[in-house]
Each structure stands twice: as C-alpha cells, then as structure tokens.
Amino acid sequence: MRSKRLLASSAVILASAATLAACGSNSSQSSAKKQTLTWMNTAEMTTLDASKATDGASYEQINNVEEGLYLLGKNAKVQNALATSTKNSADGKTWTFTIRKDAKWSNGDPVTAKDFVYSWRRTIDPKTASEYSYLFSGIKNADAIVSGKKKPAALGIKADGKYKLTVTLEKRIPYFKLLMAFPLFFPQNQKFIEKMGSKYATSSKYMVYNGPFKQVGWTGSNLSWKLVKNPTYWDKKSVKLDTVKFSVQKTPSTDYNLYQSGKLDAAFLDAQATKSLKGKTGYTQRKMSTTQYLSYNTKKHPEFKNKNLRL
C-alpha cells in the first residue's frame, strides 16, 4: 500500500510473512491473486463520523476509508494526499492548498475545497459537540467559535474556487501539516450528511467514502466487518489489498490462539507473551504515539480539589 494506514497501533505484534508482504511491499509487480488481510481491533468502534470520533478503533477505520490533504507515509513522514501543492506565507499564518481534481466520493461526487470548509465548520460548531474541537485552536477565530462567541462561518478557512483552499492562522503552528493528516480535518460531503441526517456514519451503509477503502458490514454494534477496495479512489492502482477482514478481539490470549490457528494474520501481545515470543518469526515491534493521563473527579470526591493530595 502507498501509505502505512494498516500498520498496528500496538507496540508489539505477531504478523505472518504474508501479512507483511501485503502491507509493506514496494514491488512494482502486482499479484493477479486477490489479496485479503485478516486483521483485528482490541475494542469496538463507535462511529465513522470524523467530527465525533474519539476512540482509536474508530480512527483506524476512518483513516482507511477517508482521506485529507495529507497522509502519513513511511516513518510517519507527511506526504501529499488530496493536496497537490501547498504554499505558506512568509509569516507562516496563511496556507494555500491546491486540491487534486481527480478525487471523488464513493457516490460519484467530486471532492472540492467546499467539502473542507463544510467539514471544519461542522466540527467546530458547538452544536456538534466534538470533543476534539480544541485542536482547531490557532486557526483564526477557532477559540471564539468553540466558546460560542462567534459563528462557525468566521473560522479562518475559505474556498477560493472549486479546488483551492485557504487557511488563515492566528499564529504560526509548526506542526500544522502534521495536524492536517489527522481525520478531524478531513473533508465531509455536505449533501450526503444532510440526506442521512442523524443516521450519518452510524453504520457502513450510512457513510460515503473518499479513501482507498470502503467499509461494509458494520451495523453500528457488531464485532466484525470488512474493508473493500474503493473503485472510485483516485490512487486505486497503488492499493495492494482487495479486502481487509476485521474482528474485535479483546484479550491477547484469544488473539494469539487465533493467530496460531491461521484465523488472524496478526495478533497483539501482552507483556508475558512478549517475553516468551521475542525474537521468533513474525515478532514485530513498532513505536506508537500516545498520551495517557489520570483525571480526578472533584465533584464526586471533593477532597481531590486539594492539589497537595493529588500530588
């Protein structure tokens, strides 16, 4: 695959040789045989709505079925996706993106600059209640919109024609390009969302896709589904896998047993299994980016208001 979208989010996995070949081969020769990957999640996904997702399982799916201005390639290097060219002003506060003209949604609609404008305004609108809307901070008027002091239309983003997008920042953001590869900033199809109403993104059939895969079979609560190659994806020739079969497996021991029996192409390992299997065929370690924290409930337990106690 052109991007590393399907690499495991866990630090340690066991993967079969066939899996690694399907996900990581850079060969210009493509096999005539259809390629299927049997993968797993450690938790249920909750939504396909990039504006409302907060969990890793949902973001893994969104990253594979949707696409933004950039994607993360090898070694997490930012590379162009929907953006064909980018200009940044001398003061670092104005970004201009040219969007590729051959990108389409799975319903046939073209992906345009207006899809980004709509998406960002929808996400940052307090009515949407996006838990990650704070990530827009630094974009012109974002903080004021989140706090309800300004309307979403005041956000520093505009479409200059069908395929040119301009973003205005309040200050230089050194990690801005990296931020644009996060699903929260992906485009959204306004016509489709308004047609679906409250059903939007609650199951596979209530979703429209512009990424390398389409999701099928997720009802909103079941524990297995598939990704299938998206025939309308602009770079479909670079997508090596035809199908990815997902299932939710919550315990490492179950993962490993299914892997051993050939029912999974990879398995997440717990600390004990890591020690015993380290160095064996298929054992793989990958760095992961994560933030963990503890949050004190000061309403239920007022004693936690004492900062000395918390320390």
Task: Pin down the residues of each PLM region.
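C-terminal motif of bacterial Sec signal peptides marking the signal peptidase cleavage site
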Residues: 20-22
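Aromatic- and charge-enriched surface segment that lines or borders ligand/interaction sites
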Residues: 84-132, 303
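Ligand-site clamp/hinge motif
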Residues: 232-275
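Short, well-ordered beta-strand elements
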Residues: 33-46, 84, 94-97, 116-119, ...
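Gly/Pro-rich hinge or "lid" segments in bacterial periplasmic/extracellular proteins
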Residues: 169-238, 243
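Alpha-helical secondary-structure segments
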Residues: 112-118, 162-166, 242-243, 291-311
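N-terminal lobe/hinge region of extracytoplasmic solute-binding protein
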Residues: 41-90
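Surface-exposed binding/hinge segments that line
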Residues: 133-190
